[in-house]
Amino acid sequence: MTLPADQPDVVIVGGGLAGLAAAAALGAAGFRVDLHERRPFLGGRASSWELPPAVSNGQMDGDLKVAATSIDNCQHVLLGCCTNLLDLYERLGVRHLISFHDAVPFVTPDGRVSTMQERGGPAPLHLLASLARFHPLSWRDRLAVMAGLAAVGFEPAMLGRLRLDSETMLAWLQRHLQTPRAIDYFWRPVLTSALNEDPERVSAWHGLQVFWLGFLANRAGHRVGLPAVPLGELYGAQIPGVRVHFRSAVRELRHEAGRVAGARLDDGRMAPARWLIVALPFEETARLLPGDYSAFSHSPIIGIHLWFDRPLFEAPFAALLGRTVQWAFRKLGDPGYVQCVVSAARELLPMPPDQIVETAVRELREFFPNTWAQLLRSSVIKEVRATYSAAPGMEARRPSPATPFANCFQAGDWTATGWPPTMEGAVRSGYAAAERVTQAAGRPQRFLLPELPAEGLSRWFPTARITEPRP
C-alpha cells in the first residue's frame, strides 16, 4: 500500500505507556508515526489531573491555602530493575526528573521505623543487615524470611514458570513455612504494592519475580524511583518523528484480505497506515480486535490525596504496615501534601470518599503520632481498572504482540511481556510491538533491553540462569 508523503507509516491507538514506548522507539528509528489518544493527555493510567479552580487558585475556606495545582491519579514509582522504563524516560528526555532512593522506611502503627537499605556486601547479601534489624519481625520471623528468600534463588529454575503460575503466592509462602507475621509485615506489603494484587490472588511466579529482581539479583534492583514532577509533565514533551492527536478516539479498524487498512476515528475520518499498533487495556482491545479476553479481570488502586497545614513526616515516603493505607508519599515542593496509596483496593471501592479520607487520616496519626497537623483538603481517586489481575493461570493466556492481521500488532501490560502488570511491563510490550513493526517493514531493530544482570553471589543461584522469553 502506497501512502501520500504526509501520511504516517504507523498508526498507534492509545497514548498510555505501551503506546508511548512504541511511538518513541519507532519515531527514533525513522518511521513516521501518528499516535491517537482519546483523552487530552498522555500517560494512560499514569497521568495527572487538574484540581478544581478554587484549589488551583490557592483558595480554600477563607485564608487556608493549598499550593498544589495538579495531582497524579495515584503515586507511581519504579524500581532500579525497571530497565526499559528508564530507557523510555531517556528517549523522552525526562530521565533527570526521576530521583532514586536507596533507603525504604517501614513504619509500624506505634511510630517505630525500620529502614531497608543496602549496607554493603555483594548481592544477595546487600540487604541482609537491614533484614536482621527489621524490628516488626521476631528472630523466628526473620529466619523464616531469609529461608524464603533463599528459595527464591532456586525454585523458579527448578519448577518453571507454568508450574509456579498455577499456585497463589500465599500458597507458596505457606508451603515454605513463612510465619503469619512474616507474611503480613514483610511479604504482603511488598507484593501488594508491586503487583497490585493480594498474595491470596496473585501468581506465585510473579511474586517470586518481584523478590528476585527487586531484592536479590542486583544491588540496584530495590532502589525506589520517584518523579520530581506530576506524571503529566513526564509525558508532555514532543516525541521526535511522532504526531500526537489528542481527543482522537478510534471507533473501529477497517480490514480486508487479512490486513488492516486503517482506523476509523470517532468523527468518521479514516486514519490509513501501513502498520498499526493497538496499545489499549484488554477490555478496549476487545472492541477493536478479535480474540478471547474473557479470562482477564481488573484489580483497583485508590489514591488518597491529603493536604495538611504542616509536614506530617520527614522522609520522602514510607511503607505503612498492618493497616489499610499501604504507602504514604510526601511531595517535596509542598511539605503538607501527602499521597496515600491502597493497592488491590476492592474492599474500599464501595466506601464514600469521606469515609476513605477519615480512615487514612486516622491511620496516619497512628503512624506519625507526634504531629499536630490539621487536614485542610482531600481528594480521593478510584482507579477501578488500574491493572489486570495477575492471577494463577494467566501466563498461558497472555497473548503475543501478533494479531490475526499481518500488519497489526497489540501492546499493553496484559500481553505476554514476561513481567507482571507494571509500568515496566507496559513499556516492554510497546517495545515488543515496535520490534514486530520493524521486522514486518524489513528493517528489523531491537528496542527491548535485558533485565539487570545477576551480580555477586547471586550469579550462582539457578534462578540467575533463567532467561526471560522475548515477547
Residue ranges and their predicted role:
Residues 54-160:
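Dinucleotide-binding Rossmann-like beta1-alpha1 core, especially the glycine-rich loop
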Residues 18, 41, 283:
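Conserved Rossmann-like nucleotide-cofactor binding loop
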Residues 3, 118-119, 318, 324-471:
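Conserved flavin/dinucleotide-binding core of flavoenzymes
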Residues 14, 100-101, 246-248, 254, ...:
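Short loop/edge segments at beta-strand edges and connector loops
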Residues 4-6, 29, 248-373, 464-471:
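Mid-domain catalytic core of redox enzymes
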Residues 8-35:
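N-terminal Rossmann-like FAD-binding beta1-loop-alpha1 element of flavoenzymes
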Residues 144-253, 273:
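Active-site/ligand-binding neighborhood in enzyme catalytic cores
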Residues 27-60:
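Glycine-rich FAD pyrophosphate-binding loop
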